[in-house]
C-alpha cells in the first residue's frame, strides 16, 4: 500500500503489516471507499489519525521511492519514440562535471512543461544529451595529463547522477554525446552533403587566432575588446586556409522567416532583433571616389559602401581597413605603413588610431558638378584605420564626422581643431541640430551645405544623389549583409574530424560514406606530456592515407569542426538516436520536428540559434528529409515552405546568488568569513562590521555559488523545483534565497495534511448520492428548500468555484511558460480555500475529495513524486500505474480510477455555482450605514407578488448578522418600528426609513 509517509506500514505499526492485507483485499477499490475508510474500520478512527499525526512528511523518502518506481516502469514498458507527438527540449549541457543552479532552472522548466503535456494526454519526447566536444575539455585534459575522452565520460557520469536527483522524466534511451563516434559519424555525413552542394568550401582568409588556445576563432567568438571569448587572450590576425559553411546562401530565408517566429510571440522579441541585426541586411549605395596619386601602385579609385548616401556632401576623409588591397600594395613600399600595420593585432577594434597615407588623396564624386559647394570639392585625406572592417562592404568607409559617431571620434582624434561639416538637420528651420561634439545621426532635411538639395528630405536626397552619379559610373544602388560565411575550422584535437583527404593529384577529396566515421586517433603521450597545440598535426600514421579517388598517397585534413556544428543539428538526432544508417529518418522528422518548445539561455540568441536555423533549412531540403535539390540555389528556391527548427523559444533568466562584501575594502567574503547568526544583519567575522549584501551572477571569485545537489539533499527535489519556479517569472533574473523555501515546504505540508484527512475521513459521513461533481450541484438545485443544507452547499460552491478558477488560470500559465511562478501562487491559494475550516468541514465529501484530486493533478508537473504519493493514497486502486502513465482518456472529474489521472479541465459547472450569498447595503433614512453578507433570496421571492415576503426575508437575513443586530435593534433604532422598509435590486439594498 502506498503511504504518504513513504515508509512501510508494517514497520511503523508493529505486527500490523500482515494483518492489513486481508483488510485491503476485502475492501474493493472505490472512489466512495478510500483505503483510509477500510483501515479505520479495522484500527479505529482515532488510532488511525494518531498514526498519521505521528509521522511527518518525508520528501526525501518520496523522491527516492518514486524515482525507483519510475525507473522500474520505464524498464518494463520501454520508451517508444514512434508514439511521441510532442517534443520539449532544453538546450543540452556541456559536461563540466557539476550542475549549477542555472542548469537546475532550465531543466526544471522543461520537465514541468513535459509532465504537464503528458497529463494532457500527449506522448512527450524529453531527451537529454551532452555537448561534449570543445576547448574546455581539451584544456582540462592538458592541465591534468589525461585523455579528454576519459575526462568527459567521467563528467557525464557525474552530471547524469546529479540530474537523476531532480525528479526529471528524461528519455534516457535517446541519450547522446557529441564526442561519440556514433554521433559524429553523422555530423561528418552532413558536412559531406554540404560539401557536395557547394555549401562547404575551403578558402584562404584572414582569421582570428587565439595564441593561448592555439586555434582559430569565428568573428562572433571575439569580444568587443579584441579578446578570445574562451581564454581572454588578445586575438591575432593570421592568414590561413580554412573551411567555411556557406550560410550566406540561406540569408534571405533566415531573415524572412523571422516574421513567422514573431507571430504569437513564439520567439522573444529581443532574440529576433539580435538575429536580424546579425544578419545585417542593409540597402544603400556603392560610391566610387577617384584617387589623386603621386606615386606608383595606387588605385585609380576607391569604392565605398554607404547606407547613407544623403551624407555625401559631408565626407571629410576616407578610411581603409588594414586588409584593403590598396593598403597591402602600398605597404610594400612604405616601411612606416608596415610598422603601423604590425601594431594593429594588439589594438582594440574600436581604437581611433590611424595612419595617414602620404602622397595620395581622394576626390568626392560630387566635386565634378558645378552646383556642389566648394567645401565638398576639396580633396580628401585617406587613412588606414583599425575601426574599418575588412570583411564588410568594400573594406572602406567615407568619413562623415557630422553624421556618424565613430567618424566623429576619429576626426576629432586627428583633426581636433578642424571644423566639422554638417549637411542636414532635424528640420528645415534649423541650421543644425548638432553641436561640434555631437554628430546628428538621424534622417532629416538637407541644409545649405548640400547645395541645390537644400530643403529636401534626406531620404529623397540620397536616392537622387545615387541617380545623379550613376550615369558616370560613380555610384549604384547596392544591398549588403553583415552575415559572413561560417568559419568552422579549428586547429584542435577534441572535435569532429573534417572528413576530407588532400591528394596531390586529385586535390580535395571527400571521405567515402562507407569509411565514416573518421575517428580521432589515440594520442595518450600528448596528454601525458601536457603538451599544447593540435596533436593531429604530428600523427603521421593517422594523417597519411590513400586517396579514395585515385588510390595514391594522400593526407587527412587535420582541422576539426567548430562545436557549434554539433549543436546545430543534435535536436534532429534525438528523434532517431539509434539509426545507424542516417542522422534521422524522414518519417520521424515529419512527426516530431520542428521542436515544439526549446528552452535555454539568451546568451545563445545569435550563434547557436542562427546556425541551427541554417542547418535545419538545409537538412529539410536535402535527401536526409527525403528531398533532393540539384544545387544550393535549388535548395534555397525550394524553401517556399518555412523550415524552422524550433516552433517556440523560451529564454530563462539567470540565477544570481547572495553575495557578501566587506564594506571597508569591497572584498568578496567567503561563507566562513560571514557571521549569519542573525540572518537579517550579516556581519564580517574579522571586524564585526555589517556586511554589504547584494545578488550577483554566481562565480567562484564571488563565493556565492550554490550546489543544487546539496540543496536537493536537504529539502528534496520537489520542494526545490517548486521554490525555483516560485521565486521569479521564467524570463527574469532569479535572486536565489534559500530561506524562502519555507513557504513552499509549508504549502506541501498543508496539502499532505489535506490528503491525510480525506484518506482517514470518518465512516460516519454520509457520501453524496451523486457520482460526479456536476451531478451533485444539479441535485442540489432540484432539492426542495426544506431538505437542502445551505451550509454544505455554500461551502461546496466556494471550494468548487475556486477549483474551476484555478484550473483556467494554471492551465494558461503552464501554456504560457513565462508565468510558471503564478502556478505555485494559484495552487497555494486553492489549498487555502479547501483547507479553510469553514469550507472543509461544511463541504460535501465528494467536493472535498475531487477538489484535492484536482489540486494534486495541477501540482503534479511541479512536484511529481509528492503528487504521485498523494494520488495513490487518495486512490489506492490506481497503484498499478503512475500518475504520468497517460493511459487514461477521461476528463478526470468524479472518479479515482486511471481515467482521472489527467490534467483537470473546466467541467461545465460554472452555471451551477452561483453564490448563495450576496452583499446587502443597508441605509438608514437614505444614507448608507453598513453592508453585510446575507443569504440569496429564493427565486420565488423575486416575483412582484411576493414583495412583502421578500422584505421579511431580507430583514431577517440582515438581523442574523452581528452587525445587523447591533445597528438595527439597538441604540435607538428598531427596524420593527420603522415607518417604511424599502428593498431594492432583489435585496442588494435595504433602506430603513424611521
Swiss-Prot record:
One of its GO terms (molecular function) is leucine-tRNA ligase activity. Its EC number is 6.1.1.4. Pfam families: Anticodon_1, tRNA-synt_1, tRNA-synt_1_2, tRNA-synt_1g. Its main location: mitochondrion. ATP binds at residue 700. It catalyses: tRNA(Leu) + L-leucine + ATP = L-leucyl-tRNA(Leu) + AMP + diphosphate. Keywords: Aminoacyl-tRNA synthetase, ATP-binding, Ligase, Mitochondrion, Nucleotide-binding, Protein biosynthesis, Transit peptide. Residues 1-52 form a transit peptide. Gene3D superfamilies: 3.10.20.590, HUPs, Isoleucyl-tRNA Synthetase, Domain 1, Valyl/Leucyl/Isoleucyl-tRNA synthetase, editing domain. It is found in: Mitochondrion matrix. A motif ('KMSKS' region) lies at residues 697-701. GO terms for cellular component: mitochondrial matrix; mitochondrion. One of its GO terms (biological process) is leucyl-tRNA aminoacylation. InterPro entries: aa-tRNA-synth_I_CS, aa-tRNA-synth_Ia, Leu-tRNA-ligase, Leu_tRNA-synth_edit, M/V/L/I-tRNA-synth_anticd-bd, Methionyl/Leucyl_tRNA_Synth, Rossmann-like_a/b/a_fold, tRNAsynth_Ia_anticodon-bd. A motif ('HIGH' region) lies at residues 93-103. Belongs to the class-I aminoacyl-tRNA synthetase family. NCBIfam families: leuS_bact. This is Leucine--tRNA ligase, mitochondrial. It comes from Neurospora crassa (strain ATCC 24698 / 74-OR23-1A / CBS 708.71 / DSM 1257 / FGSC 987).
Amino acid at each position: 500500500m502506498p503511504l504518504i509517509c513513504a515508509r512501510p506500514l508494517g514497520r511503523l505499526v508493529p505486527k500490523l503489516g500482515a494483518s492489513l492485507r486481508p483488510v485491503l483485499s476485502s475492501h474493493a477499490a472505490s472512489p466512495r471507499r478510500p483505503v483510509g475508510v477500510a483501515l479505520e474500520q479495522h484500527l479505529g478512527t482515532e488510532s488511525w489519525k494518531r498514526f498519521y499525526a505521528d509521522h511527518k512528511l518525508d520528501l526525501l523518502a518520496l523522491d527516492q521511492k518514486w524515482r525507483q518506481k519510475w525507473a522500474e516502469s520505464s524498464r518494463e514498458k520501454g520508451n517508444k519514440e514512434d508514439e511521441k507527438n510532442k517534443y520539449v527540449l532544453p538546450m543540452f549541457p556541456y559536461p563540466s562535471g557539476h550542475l549549477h543552479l542555472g542548469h537546475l532552472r532550465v531543466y526544471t522548466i522543461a520537465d514541468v512543461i513535459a509532465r504537464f503535456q503528458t497529463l494532457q494526454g500527449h506522448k512527450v519526447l524529453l531527451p537529454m544529451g551532452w555537448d561534449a566536444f570543445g576547448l574546455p575539455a581539451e584544456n582540462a585534459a592538458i592541465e591534468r595529463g589525461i585523455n579528454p575522452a576519459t575526462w568527459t565520460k567521467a563528467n557525464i557520469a557525474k552530471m547524469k547522477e546529479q540530474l537523476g536527483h531532480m525528479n526529471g522524466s528524461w528519455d534516457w534511451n535517446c541519450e547522446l554525446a557529441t564526442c561519440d563516434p556514433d554521433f559524429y559519424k553523422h555530423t561528418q555525413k552532413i558536412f559531406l552533403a554540404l560539401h557536395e552542394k557547394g555549401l562547404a568550401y575551403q578558402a584562404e582568409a584572414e582569421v582570428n587566432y587565439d595564441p593561448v588556445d592555439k586555434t582559430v576563432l569565428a568573428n562572433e567568438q571575439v569580444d568587443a575588446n579584441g579578446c578570445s571569448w574562451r581564454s581572454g587572450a588578445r586575438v591575432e590576425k593570421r592568414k590561413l586556409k580554412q573551411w567555411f559553411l556557406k550560410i550566406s546562401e540561406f540569408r534571405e530565408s533566415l531573415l524572412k522567416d523571422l516574421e513567422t517566429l514573431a507571430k504569437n510571440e513564439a520567439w522573444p522579441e529581443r532574440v529576433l532583433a539580435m538575429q536580424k541585426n546579425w544578419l545585417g541586411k542593409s540597402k544603400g549605395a556603392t560610391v566610387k571616389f577617384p584617387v589623386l596619386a603621386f606615386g606608383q601602385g595606387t588605385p585609380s579609385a576607391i569604392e565605398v559602401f554607404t547606407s547613407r548616401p544623403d551624407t555625401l556632401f559631408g565626407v571629410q576623409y576616407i578610411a581603409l581597413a588594414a586588409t584593403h588591397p590598396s593598403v597591402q600594395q602600398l605597404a610594400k613600399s612604405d616601411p612606416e605603413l608596415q610598422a603601423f600595420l604590425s601594431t594593429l593585432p594588439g589594438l582594440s577594434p574600436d581604437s581611433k588610431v590611424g595612419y595617414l597615407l602620404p602622397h595620395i588623396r581622394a576626390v568626392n564624386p560630387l566635386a565634378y558638378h558645378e552646383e556642389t559647394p566648394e567645401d565638398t570639392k576639396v580633396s580628401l585625406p585617406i587613412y588606414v584605420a583599425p575601426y574599418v572592417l575588412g570583411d564588410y562592404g568594400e573594406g572602406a568607409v567615407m568619413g562623415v564626422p557630422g553624421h556618424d559617431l565613430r567618424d566623429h571620434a576619429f576626426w576629432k582624434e586627428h583633426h581636433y581643431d578642424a571644423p566639422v561639416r554638417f549637411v542636414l538637420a532635424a528640420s528645415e528651420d534649423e541650421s543644425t541640430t548638432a553641436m561640434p561634439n555631437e554628430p546628428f545621426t538621424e534622417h532629416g532635411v538637407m541644409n545649405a551645405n548640400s547645395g541645390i538639395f537644400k530643403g529636401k528630405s534626406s531620404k529623397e536626397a540620397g536616392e537622387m544623389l545615387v541617380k545623379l552619379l550613376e550615369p558616370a559610373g560613380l555610384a549604384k544602388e547596392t544591398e549588403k549583409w553583415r552575415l559572413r560565411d561560417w568559419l568552422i575550422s579549428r586547429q584542435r584535437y577534441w572535435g569532429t574530424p573534417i572528413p576530407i583527404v588532400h591528394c596531390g593529384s586529385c586535390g580535395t577529396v571527400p571521405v567515402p560514406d562507407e569509411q565514416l566515421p573518421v575517428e580521432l586517433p589515440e594520442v595518450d603521450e600528448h596528454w601525458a606530456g601536457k603538451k599544447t597545440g593540435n596533436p593531429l598535426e604530428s600523427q603521421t600514421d593517422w594523417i597519411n592515407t590513400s586517396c579514395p579517388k585515385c588510390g595514391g598517397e594522400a593526407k587527412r585534413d587535420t582541422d576539426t569542426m567548430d562545436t557549434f556544428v554539433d549543436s546545430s543539428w543534435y535536436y534532429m538526432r534525438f528523434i532517431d538516436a539509434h539509426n545507424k544508417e542516417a542522422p534521422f529518418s524522414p518519417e520521424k522528422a515529419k512527426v516530431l520536428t520542428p521542436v515544439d518548445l526549446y528552452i535555454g539561455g539568451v546568451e545563445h540568441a545569435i550563434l547557436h540559434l542562427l546556425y541551427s536555423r541554417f542547418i535545419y533549412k538545409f537538412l529539410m531540403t536535402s535527401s536526409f528529409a527525403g528531398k533532393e535539390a540539384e544545387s544550393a540555389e535549388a535548395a534555397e528556391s525550394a524553401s517556399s515552405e518555412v523550415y524552422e527548427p524550433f516552433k517556440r523559444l523560451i529564454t530563462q533568466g539567470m540565477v544570481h546568488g547572495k553575495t557578501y562584501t566587506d564594506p571597508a575594502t569591497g572584498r568578496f567574503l567567503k561563507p566562513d568569513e560571514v557571521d549569519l547568526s542573525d540572518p537579517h544583519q550579516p556581519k564580517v567575522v574579522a571586524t564585526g562590521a555589517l556586511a554589504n549584501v547584494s545578488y550577483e551572477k554566481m562565480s567562484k571569485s564571488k563565493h556565492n555559488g550554490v550546489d543544487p545537489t546539496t540543496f536537493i539533499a536537504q529539502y528534496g527535489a520537489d520542494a526545490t523545483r517548486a521554490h525555483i519556479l516560485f521565486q521569479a517569472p521564467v524570463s527574469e533574473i532569479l535572486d536565489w534565497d534559500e530561506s524562502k523555501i519555507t513557504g513552499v515546504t509549508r504549502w506541501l505540508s498543508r496539502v499532505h495534511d489535506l490528503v491525510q484527512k480525506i484518506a482517514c475521513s470518518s465512516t460516519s459521513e454520509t457520501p453524496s448520492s451523486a457520482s460526479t461533481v456536476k451531478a451533485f450541484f444539479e441535485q442540489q438545485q432540484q432539492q426542495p428548500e426544506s431538505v437542502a443544507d445551505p451550509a454544505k452547499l455554500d461551502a461546496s460552491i466556494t471550494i468548487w468555484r475556486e477549483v474551476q478558477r484555478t484550473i483556467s488560470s494554471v492551465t494558461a500559465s503552464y501554456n504560457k511558460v513565462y508565468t510558471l511562478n503564478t502556478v505555485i501562487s494559484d495552487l497555494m491559494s486553492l489549498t487555502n480555500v479547501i483547507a479553510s475550516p469553514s469550507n472543509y468541514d461544511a463541504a460535501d465529501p465528494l467536493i472535498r475529495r475531487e477538489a484535492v484530486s484536482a489540486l494534486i493533478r495541477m501540482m503534479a508537473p511541479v512536484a511529481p513524486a509528492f503528487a504521485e504519493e498523494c494520488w495513490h493514497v487518495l486512490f489506492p486502486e490506481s497503484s498499478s500505474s503512475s500518475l504520468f502513465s497517460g493511459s487514461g482518456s477521461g476528463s478526470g472529474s468524479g472518479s479515482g480510477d486511471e481515467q482521472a489521472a489527467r490534467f483537470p479541465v473546466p467541467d461545465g459547472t460554472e452555471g451551477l455555482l452561483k453564490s448563495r450569498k450576496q452583499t446587502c447595503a443597508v441605509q438608514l433614512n437614505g444614507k448608507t450605514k453598513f453592508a453585510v453578507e446575507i443569504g440569496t433570496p429564493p427565486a420565488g421571492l423575486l416575483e412582484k407578488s411576493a414583495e412583502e415576503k421578500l422584505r421579511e426575508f431580507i430583514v431577517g437575513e440582515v438581523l442574523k448578522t452581528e452587525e445587523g443586530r447591533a445597528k438595527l435593534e439597538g441604540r435607538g433604532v428598531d427596524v420593527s418600528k420603522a415607518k417604511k422598509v424599502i428593498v431594492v435590486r432583489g435585496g442588494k439594498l435595504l433602506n430603513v426609513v424611521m
